[in-house]
Design a protein with these regions (language model features):
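Amphipathic alpha-helical assembly/interaction segments
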Residues: 1-117
Length: 117
């Protein structure tokens, strides 16, 4: 991720998923890394995919549902990143940046959900 923040959430979630994919390319191909990376690739992509679906809502109930799924996927991405950080010493700084980004996604999505209530 660059130093300049992306404020469009669709673009920002795309950048997060992309950056997670760049990360997994560079990690050692251990059994645990392969499994954790598969999960990270899925969950990081789902953050943005569900956010996009929320924007194409079929109603308020669908909007909240999709936003909650997007937030859940951000939480899950954070979990996989934390596991990867513990087992990949040489990539800790890069992974920590992604953990912070996942956390920011959670906060942003929570704020949107709370405004809808």
């Amino acid at each position: 991720m660059g130093k300049d923040k992306i404020y469009n959430l669709e673009d920002r979630t795309f950048a997060f998923a992309r950056d997670c994919r760049f990360l997994v390319r560079n990690l050692k191909k251990t059994i645990s890394n392969l499994e954790d990376c598969k999960q990270l690739v899925r969950s990081s992509g789902s953050v943005g995919a569900n956010y996009i679906e929320a924007n194409e809502k079929l109603g308020d109930k669908d909007l909240k549902f999709r936003l909650r799924i997007s937030r859940k996927e951000a939480k899950e991405s954070e979990y996989w990143l934390k596991l990867l950080k513990e087992l990949n010493e040489t990539h800790k700084d890069r992974i920590e940046e992604l953990i912070l980004e996942a956390s920011e996604h959670k906060k942003i999505l929570s704020a949107i959900i709370n405004k809808l209530k």
